[in-house]
Amino acid sequence: YWTYNIVMDTPLKQKAEFRLGQIVSHSKFRYRGVIVDADPYFQGTEEWYENVAKSKPAKNKPWYHVLVHGQGNETYVAEGNLLSDENTDPIDHPFIEVFFNEYDNSGSYSLKQNFN
């Protein structure tokens, strides 16, 4: 992934720690999920950040869209709040088949198409 210098709008070589289709867990809330999209830096509103992101994670690092296991929702999570999930069980979410072709039994799904 590429991130951009917000002031100069120039590409920086900053690699995201997680990849699309990877199963992760939230370090604070302990839920599991799968990454369906990634932003090179926070792209939400300032209001959302102030009201929802209580721990005030870094805005200039990657943020991820995660389908939450066992629920029908998606979360927007800072890279610093995610961990690789050691549990390789598949994710149960109603939109899994919308984004992914198959699960490889090692903690990763293959994308149907490139959404990013």
Mark where each language-model region is.
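Mixed-charge, Lys/Arg-rich low-complexity intrinsically disordered regions
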Residues: W2-I23, F29-R32, D39-F42, Q113-N116
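Short, solvent-exposed secondary-structure boundary/capping segments
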Residues: F42-N51
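Structured beta-strand/turn binding interfaces of compact recognition modules in eukaryotic regulators
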Residues: S27, V36, H69
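Short, glycine/acidic-enriched capping/hinge loops at junctions between secondary-structure elements
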Residues: V36-D37, E46
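Intrinsically disordered, low-complexity, charged/polar segments
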Residues: P57-N116
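Short proline/glycine-enriched turn/loop segments at secondary-structure junctions
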Residues: N51-P57
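Aromatic side chains
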Residues: F18, Y31, W48-Y49, Y64, ...
